[in-house]
């Protein structure tokens, strides 16, 4: 199993995910969103599963700084906005084949690794 992790080096939750997989010797590919934004296709894949609204980090500083906590953002505008400003994304986004996860949930990934074990 190889896990792709979208996050930033400053994000504690992304660091927890990286450490979790490293400790279990699971190969990871880290995409630093501060260096390279997630592609529109990747964002669409996560939005189809969780909804575009769920991808927004409503508790993040960038969300408040842009005044989005008081504005109504339509579903159609969320993906282009996330593409343009990855700092608005709730991280980490994790993908292992067809398995997708939004935010860090250690229990969920322990179960997934158990299921994937030969």
Where would I find each of the regions flagged by the language model?
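Local sequence-structure signature of Cys/Sec-based thiol-disulfide redox active-site neighborhoods
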Residues: 1-24, 28-36
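Thiol/selenol-based redox catalytic cores and closely related redox-interacting motifs
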Residues: 33-118
